[in-house]
């Protein structure tokens, strides 16, 4: 009952959690949480599989076209794939959000047409989501703009804690039958960067960001979602040669 109240309904969600996470979420002791996780992992038979079995699991991977043949080619030929996180970083106006908006439309196509026959969740941290642009993309593709917009679930995240909380909401929506196949976070690091200013808070920021990325990966793995995130850039003054521009977030990103 406590697990259901916390929005946890399946074994995989329990199996990939840490005892402290499960304990905090469900309001149970670490010892009880540890036993629950062990039981879930045993029932799911999580462990090693041979290459043939792993290849069979890979057959369930979904691919969503980006709208650019060249970009699809760079991503392996078929676009953004499920059960993984795809990051796009660049300067303001470089097209990161545009790719995300196009993916939000394309995910609604049938699988055989380069989509995933599902809905998109768009976590907007910087006020970049534009319904008018979605309508333009849909009209160009000869799709019903209003129907396309109804299949995109948008949430404006106002701080990093809100951004983290929204991931739990996504799990609840999927449990309630929403066919979500794409999660977009635009942008990944904006709130973390603003709230943890200065070198003195760098370690705290990196820990929180690292945990958030791990939660994104758990969502992607548990529900066979594709995750697309955009990221800001900064200049590395210590770099003597080449392009000093690098993605915000350091090695954990």
Predicted features along the sequence, with ranges:
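Residue-level signature of catalytic and energy-coupling elements of molecular machines
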Residues: 14, 71, 88, 134, ...
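Generic enzyme active-site microenvironment
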Residues: 85, 122, 184, 229-230
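Phosphate-binding/switch region of NTP-binding enzymes
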Residues: 206-253
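Compact, charge-rich alpha-helical regulatory domains located at protein termini
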Residues: 1-54
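Conserved, well-folded catalytic cores of nucleic-acid-processing
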Residues: 6, 17, 39-46, 74-78, ...
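Amphipathic alpha-helical transducer elements in NTP-driven molecular machines
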Residues: 65-68, 72, 82, 97-98, ...
């Amino acid at each position: 009952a406590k697990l259901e109240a916390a929005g946890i309904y399946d074994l995989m969600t329990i199996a990939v959690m840490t005892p402290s996470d499960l304990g905090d979420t469900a309001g149970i002791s670490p010892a009880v949480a540890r036993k629950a996780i062990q039981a879930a992992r045993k029932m799911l038979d999580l462990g090693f599989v041979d290459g043939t079995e792993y290849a069979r699991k890979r057959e369930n991977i979904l691919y969503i076209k980006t709208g650019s043949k060249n970009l699809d080619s760079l991503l392996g030929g078929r676009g953004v794939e499920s059960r993984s996180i795809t990051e796009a970083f660049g300067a303001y106006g470089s097209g990161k959000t545009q790719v995300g908006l196009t993916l939000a439309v394309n995910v609604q196509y049938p699988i055989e047409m380069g989509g995933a026959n599902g809905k998109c969740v768009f976590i907007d941290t910087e006020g970049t989501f534009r319904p008018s642009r979605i309508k333009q993309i849909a009209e160009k593709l000869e799709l019903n703009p209003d129907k396309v917009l109804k299949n995109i679930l948008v949430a404006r995240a106002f701080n990093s804690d809100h951004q983290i909380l929204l991931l739990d909401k996504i799990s609840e929506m999927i449990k309630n039958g929403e066919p979500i196949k794409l999660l977009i976070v635009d942008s990944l690091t904006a709130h973390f960067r603003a709230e943890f200013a200065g070198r003195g808070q760098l370690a705290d920021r990196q820990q929180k960001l690292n945990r958030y990325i791990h939660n994104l990966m758990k969502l992607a793995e548990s529900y066979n979602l594709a995750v697309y995130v955009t990221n800001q850039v900064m200049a590395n003054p210590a770099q003597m040669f080449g392009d000093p521009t690098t993605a915000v977030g350091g090695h954990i990103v």
